[in-house]
């Protein structure tokens, strides 16, 4: 018995045990995972935005944290309201037109470029059945959009109250250091700091990259006189949240619409545009926004996306890579550059 107690008192075993307990608790609350993830995402992004805005405004005059947070959430509420009344009808109409166009292409596959060559290699492809199945999946998600919308509103409210009372919350949580739950507090604080640093950093980078991809794609499609600009831009933004694979996936519908709009030359143009945007993402945005320890080989990226989508569904495509990077950070799996920088950084701090 003493040996068993000594075994669980080992720091590594204790940390792993608490991690398993935390994972089990999250599994018990899996029905609320949307609210939990949305609250964390909104809190993290708004906290970073508040810091940037306050640093900029402080160059001219002093402003409190609460004033900036209040302004940001009021601005967000105004944007959501205006977007709902002004842009929603336009976007909804364009998405309906986009759906009709995809249906037309599905039931007339001869309009797809190189369709004869594809069928000669892979055999007959019943595209209409795939499209029907895809629309059934989309309809299932749209049927729950009211529930998801309520979760978004609740997550925004929770994130606002969290940011308002961030100092009081940290002071309250610090009381657990001297409580009987000190061991749990120390390990949870360790995982929390790692989670915010890696998971939050990667998510923030994904949102910025998706926004830049969306803007660049919108400009390119506008120059090429594409139809349904807003609908396609929203599609590109959400696909851009999927690391690496999102850019490739967006190429398929864009190429089909490009062919129906301007023929083979437009397909070539859109391929060049997507490759140019992917090059900007790979060689400029990723090195600027992500640290060395978050860079993954393409094979690992796609493997993680496949498994995370299987276990977590649509959320897995967005949070799969951040969770994987978080686990790597816990295990201290870093690049040689990071390890060589670590001692120097620590010595500088001392």
UniProtKB/Swiss-Prot annotation:
Subcellular localization, as worded in the UniProt entry: Cell membrane
InterPro entries given in the database record: AI-2E-like
UniProt entry keywords in alphabetical sequence: Cell membrane, Membrane, Transmembrane, Transmembrane helix, Transport
Cell membrane as UniProt keyword: yes
GO BP terms, alphabetized: transmembrane transport
SS bond list: none
GO CC, any one term: plasma membrane
Residue intervals passing through the bilayer: 18-38, 67-87, 145-165, 207-227, 229-249, 257-277, 289-309, 311-331
Membrane-topology annotation of the record: Multi-pass membrane protein
Assigned protein family: Belongs to the autoinducer-2 exporter (AI-2E) (TC 2.A.86) family.
Protein name: Putative transport protein YdbI
């Amino acid at each position: 018995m003493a040996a068993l107690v000594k075994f669980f008192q080992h720091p590594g075993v204790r940390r792993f045990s608490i991690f398993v307990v935390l994972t089990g608790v999250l599994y018990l609350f899996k029905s609320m995972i949307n609210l939990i993830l949305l609250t964390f995402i909104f809190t993290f992004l708004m906290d970073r935005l508040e810091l940037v805005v306050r640093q900029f405004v402080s160059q001219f005059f002093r402003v409190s944290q609460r004033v900036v947070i209040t302004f940001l959430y009021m601005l967000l509420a105004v944007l959501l309201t205006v977007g709902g009344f002004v842009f929603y009808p336009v976007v909804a109409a364009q998405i309906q037109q986009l759906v009709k166009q995809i249906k037309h292409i599905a039931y007339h596959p001869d309009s797809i470029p190189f369709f004869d060559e594809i069928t000669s290699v892979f055999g007959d492809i019943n595209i209409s059945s795939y499209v029907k199945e895809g629309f059934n999946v989309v309809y299932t998600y749209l049927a729950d959009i009211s529930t998801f919308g309520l979760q978004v509103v609740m997550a925004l409210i929770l994130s606002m109250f969290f940011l308002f009372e961030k100092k009081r919350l940290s002071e309250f949580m610090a009381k657990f250091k001297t409580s009987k739950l000190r061991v749990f507090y120390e390990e949870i604080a360790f995982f929390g700091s790692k989670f915010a640093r890696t998971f939050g950093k990667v998510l923030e980078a994904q949102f910025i990259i998706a926004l830049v991809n969306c803007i660049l794609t919108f400009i390119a499609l506008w120059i090429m006189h594409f139809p349904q600009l807003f609908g396609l831009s929203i599609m590109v933004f959400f696909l851009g949240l999927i690391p690496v694979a999102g850019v490739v996936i967006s190429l398929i519908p864009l190429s089909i619409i490009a062919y129906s709009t301007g023929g083979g030359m437009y397909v070539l143009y859109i391929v060049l545009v997507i490759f140019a945007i992917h090059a900007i993402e790979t060689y400029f945005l990723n090195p600027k926004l992500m640290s060395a320890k978050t860079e993954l080989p393409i094979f690992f990226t796609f493997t993680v996306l496949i498994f995370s989508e299987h276990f977590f569904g649509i959320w897995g495509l967005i949070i799969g890579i951040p969770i994987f990077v978080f686990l790597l950070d816990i295990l201290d799996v870093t690049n040689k550059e990071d390890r060589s920088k670590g001692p120097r950084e620590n010595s500088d701090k001392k």
